[in-house]
Amino acid sequence: MELKQALQKLGKSAEFKKWKKTHAEAFLAHAFVMLDDANKDNVQFGFFDSKSDRMTPFMVEPKKVSALPESEVFKSEQSITPLVMEHVQLTDEKALEIADEFMKKNYPAELPIKTFFIVQHLDLGCVFNITFFTKSLKTLNLKISVVDGKIVKHSFESLISGMM
């Protein structure tokens, strides 16, 4: 499901409208998609409430919308900035195409076994934060601008090296 379409579906849902009445200050902080067969049509949106320092995720599925349990937010040095979907000019399909091309060009021997992405506003700007887990137990992470599709940062790391 396309992100903007999923967000519209969320905004129209009775469950979200009811929740928003008691969380008027909360704002959209991220959109998360796991690209496996079981979840590829689902989008999770996280709404941050700065008064309570809590995140409430909503799962948008093809046939239903549901709130998931709220949780405390892991605090890093970086503050949580609103995700303004109107600023997202790149489609998730195009962002994934850019990431896939980068991986094939720079790491042709790596075979992805799991892929997910988060759209969020970081210090680098608003990005598609895409991660590939590979068959060789490595991760490729790319941060791609939602405006122009440029890769603003990437890293390639072994999951095993950190365990030894």
Region roles according to the model:
Residues 1-164:
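Long, terminal "pre-/pro-" and other extracytoplasmic accessory regions
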